[in-house]
Amino acid sequence: MMIPWQELSSETLDNLIESFVLREGTDYGEHERSLEQKVADVKRQLQCGEAVLVWSELHETVNIMPREQFRE
């Protein structure tokens, strides 16, 4: 189920994004990016619709994923 990120408090959204970024551990190439930069990137992706916030009833978890990968 998709969660409208706009309905979350900014603190909750920031905490979810930070948790996601720390969990992902993605390699950003030659230049490591700060946590703040990674959080800002994910927030921008949510704002422009490239990424969505998703609740998994099966796993009872929240995740962030590319919009094109989301299947209801």
Curated annotation (Swiss-Prot):
Membrane-spanning intervals of the chain: none
Recorded superkingdom: Bacteria
Matching InterPro entries: UPF0270, YehU-like_sf
Pfam families with a match to the protein in the record: UPF0270
UniProt-listed SUPFAM superfamilies: YehU-like (SSF118001)
Family: Belongs to the UPF0270 family.
Protein name as catalogued: UPF0270 protein CKO_04772
Organism of derivation: Citrobacter koseri (strain ATCC BAA-895 / CDC 4225-83 / SGSC4696)
Organism lineage string: Bacteria, Pseudomonadati, Pseudomonadota, Gammaproteobacteria, Enterobacterales
